[in-house]
Amino acid sequence: MAIEEFLLRRFEEPDAVREFPLGRFELVEIGGMTIGRATYQPGWKWSEHVGSSPEERCMVEHLGIVISGRAAVVGPDYDEVMEPGDVFAVPPDHDSWVVGDEPYVSLHFLGADEYASPE
């Protein structure tokens, strides 16, 4: 993909916003990509606030970077805590939740278009 023109966007003016309890996911389309900004409040957990049951897991892959806060991510063969500055690649079949009392913010470069999408 070649970039042929200068483009500038801000998450304060997103193309779409997906809201759910204790969180929101803002989407910006730019240069043929969809980039997402996730903001989750303390107490947020994917299986409780985005998934339809506590046993459900997120089946979207993610590639991104943590901006602030901390979040745990657990899959079939990993259990990690992500912190500011971490660059992450998370395969499908995982759960995640905010760790601590600070909001968690991350940018998503892969999987943003599918994440928390209305069915």
Model-based region annotation:
Residues 33, 51-53, 57-77:
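Glycine- and acidic-residue-biased ligand/ion/polar-headgroup-sensing regions
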Residues 38, 90, 94-95, 100-119:
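A short hydrophobic beta-strand segment most commonly corresponding to one strand
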